[in-house]
Amino acid sequence: MHALVPFLLALAWDLTLGEPPAKLHPVVWFGRIAGFIDSRYKRRSPVLDFTAGLLTALVVITFAFLLSIVPFYAPFPLNYFLAAYLLKSSFAIKSLHEHVSRTITDDIEEKRRAVSMIVSRNTKVLDEAHLNSAAIESLAENLNDSVVAPLFYFLLFGLQGAVIYRAVNTLDAMLGYRNERYEFFGKFSARLDDALNFIPARLTVLLYLPLGGRKVPEYYRLARFKINSDKPMAAMSAVLGVWLEKPGVYRFPGKEPKNEDIKRALRIYWLVVTGWVIVVVLLLATGVCPCLSL
């Protein structure tokens, strides 16, 4: 089974139908497995908590791997459908656009509600400019997490790479917090997610270069606050020319972000996505990438 066919099917699925129903979404399954174990494990000590978190991650990753090889054993043409379905579940192009688009409103309370759906910070204490910033930051970060990274691992390792990456990213989203409950239980998931995103986050920055020129590397040098997630944010800030800030954590310089800048950010998002999709198609079609078949 040539990998290009399931990719094109998955891409068409994403752009037309969007996300599968929650009950049938592999990402939801990953989250439910992790949540089930998390809710039943009583915290004991740093070593035991870390070990339990590691085992939780291994359970979810093993499930993701087993799920990803199902198409290998399915008859034609069901194998193509299953491969496309699982691959589509690993990335989210249309859904990310829709979530960020909802933050474009002059109603401050509606904007707070929309932004709260895509960031973990307390939106009730944010003014309009910081709400706009948070929306753009989320778009930039998730361009890597939800588009570039899963397809990067698809190119390297096929369907298994994309699905396992999404499982790890889901684990980090659920368990990768630095608080009393997850400091040790979620540490393995958080560090594994950092490792897997190291190259894709920087690849995402490169995809901004045709749009931002020399400003992109200038802003990239300012991104010293986090291992990965601030790199795409810096690139987006450079291209837009607006400041992006999480108070007390990081700030990239520029003019105050407005509603119009979220619209501009979405246009930039689609340009970067289009460029990345073209790269993926060319690598799959020409045989340059290491993984040509599922």
UniProtKB/Swiss-Prot annotation:
One of its GO terms (cellular component) is plasma membrane. Pathway: Cofactor biosynthesis; adenosylcobalamin biosynthesis. One of its GO terms (biological process) is cobalamin biosynthetic process. It is a multi-pass membrane protein. One of its GO terms (molecular function) is threonine-phosphate decarboxylase activity. It comes from the Archaea. The chain crosses the membrane at residues 52-72, 73-93, 145-165, 268-288. The keyword tRNA processing does not apply. It is found in: Cell membrane. Keywords: Cell membrane, Cobalamin biosynthesis, Membrane, Transmembrane, Transmembrane helix. Pfam families: CobD_Cbib. Its main location: membrane. Converts cobyric acid to cobinamide by the addition of aminopropanol on the F carboxylic group. PANTHER family: COBALAMIN BIOSYNTHESIS PROTEIN CBIB. NCBIfam families: cobal_cbiB. HAMAP family: CobD_CbiB. Belongs to the CobD/CbiB family. This is Probable cobalamin biosynthesis protein CobD. It comes from Thermococcus kodakarensis (strain ATCC BAA-918 / JCM 12380 / KOD1).
